[in-house]
Amino acid sequence: MKIRLHTLLAVLTAAPLLLAAAGCGSKPPSGSPETGAGAGTVATTPASSPVTLAETGSTLLYPLFNLWGPAFHERYPNVTITAQGTGSGAGIAQAAAGTVNIGASDAYLSEGDMAAHKGLMNIALAISAQQVNYNLPGVSEHLKLNGKVLAAMYQGTIKTWDDPQIAALNPGVNLPGTAVVPLHRSDGSGDTFLFTQYLSKQDPEGWGKSPGFGTTVDFPAVPGALGENGNGGMVTGCAETPGCVAYIGISFLDQASQRGLGEAQLGNSSGNFLLPDAQSIQAAAAGFASKTPANQAISMIDGPAPDGYPIINYEYAIVNNRQKDAATAQTLQAFLHWAITDGNKASFLDQVHFQPLPPAVVKLSDALIATISS
């Protein structure tokens, strides 16, 4: 399987941070987390002095940080959390450069990434998923698609929606002869990381060999294909482009539905087709809690659960375990602990269609949070 290694921006003054998957499916990376001078009990309350925590990165996580930030500030008025949706690649780059406290990411750092940048950690915050949407006026059914067919659509070998390969998955559906217009992210994106892992796993001899997967890949040059910035850009671009197919983070499910986009049932490794609802996401995630390593770098794509949705993931805070001062370190610990406990309640997660971390994974996240120091 070809893995694209993505060098992150000139903002990094040290060795380049490589955004590559270290494993796929049930063979995750393993290893121990970096520990710092602050290893021990997690701070559950922030410092009493005014502290601002800066977050940037994943547009999939951005709506959740927009819920978490004000709620934490209401509880602790001396703490301000700023959030920006810039894409996972930018979030990781800025966390590595030390320009933000939290780099939000749908993609995990591999062992190689963490070895190159001592102190950077993956801290799982919640469980998310990715949907595949399309713009086909007159088609009301949830079309069935799988990774091999989607790979052919993104490679340009399936050119129209009435192609026999799509029709074979959707008997009885009146498919139009509309041209397929693949949409992909133009920014470094954890959503691209997830989607291209799915294509690579289900089409290992095709997409898996080239272009492979990563936060940025060389998408095939397909006539009419479009690049869009962020999940919001993907929703808007697809809504304005009949025939489009697009991969979009589940926190934008409501926006996609409001714009009239269709939502696909995706095929998993058992040959079952599912929508990304709470039941199918939780079923897929259940088998990974005991397999999650201490450094939390694990692919959850297309796992073995027959009733599991195939594109799920942990959403991560990419954090350096050394912060600029004790007040920032304490406050960052307190906020991240709150995020995986109180912040994992349905009152927050249901608004973005996320699922809570299993208790075993909360313990792993807390162990990493406890290492944050100054």
Swiss-Prot record:
Location of this chain's protein in the cell: Cell membrane; Cell surface; Secreted, Cell wall; Secreted
Post-translational modification: Glycosylated, probably with mannose residues; treatment with alpha-D-mannosidase abolishes its interaction with concanavalin A.
Entry membrane topology: Lipid-anchor
Disruption phenotype: No growth phenotype in phosphate-rich medium (3.6 mM Pi), decreased phosphate uptake in phosphate-depleted medium. Grows faster than wild-type in restricted (Sauton) phosphate-free medium, even after nutrient starvation. Decreased growth in infected BALB/c and C57BL/6 mice for up to 5 months after infection.
Technological use: When used as a vaccine has immunostimulatory properties; it stimulates the differentiation of unrelated antigen memory CD4+ T-cells to produce IFN-gamma, IL-17 and IL-22.
Region of interest: Disordered: 25-48
Span of the signal peptide: 1-23
Gene Ontology terms: cellular component: ATP-binding cassette (ABC) transporter complex; cell surface; cytosol; extracellular region; peptidoglycan-based cell wall; plasma membrane
Lipidation (S-diacylglycerol cysteine): C24
Lipid group attachment sites (N-palmitoyl cysteine): C24
GO biological process: cell adhesion; cellular response to phosphate starvation; phosphate ion transmembrane transport; phosphate ion transport
Matching Gene3D superfamilies: Periplasmic binding protein-like II
Major localisation: membrane
InterPro entries: ABC_phos-bd_PstS, PBP_domain, Phosphate-bind_PstS
Induction: Transcription slightly induced by phosphate starvation, part of the pstB3-pstS2-pstC1-pstA2 operon. Strongly induced by phosphate starvation (at protein level). Also shown to be only slightly induced by phosphate starvation; results may depend on growth media (at protein level).
GO MF term set: phosphate ion binding
Keyword annotations from UniProtKB, A to Z: Cell adhesion, Cell membrane, Cell wall, Glycoprotein, Lipoprotein, Membrane, Palmitate, Phosphate transport, Secreted, Signal, Transport, Virulence
Chain sites annotated for binding phosphate: S58, T59, L60, S88, D106, R185, S186, D187, G188, S189, G190, D191
PANTHER family the record matches: PHOSPHATE-BINDING PROTEIN PSTS
Family affiliation: Belongs to the PstS family.
Summary of the function given for this chain in its UniProt record: Functions in inorganic phosphate uptake, although probably not the main uptake protein under phosphate starvation. Binds phosphate; probably able to bind both H(2)PO(4)(-) and HPO(4)(2-). Part of the ABC transporter complex PstSACB involved in phosphate import. A host TLR2 agonist (toll-like receptor), shown experimentally for human and mouse. Requires both host TLR1 and TLR2 as coreceptors to elicit host response in mouse (TLR6 may also play a role) neither CD14 or CD36 function as accessory receptors. Protein purified from culture filtrate induces host (human) monocytes to produce TNF-alpha, IL-6 and IL-12 p40 (IL12B) via ERK1/2 (MAPK3 and MAPK1) and p38 MAPK pathways; MEK inhibitors U0126 and PD98059 and p38 inhibitor SB203580 block most cytokine production.
Subunit and interaction comment: The ABC transporter complex is composed of two ATP-binding proteins (PstB), two transmembrane proteins (PstC and PstA) and a solute-binding protein (PstS).
Full protein name: Phosphate-binding protein PstS 1
Gene: pstS1
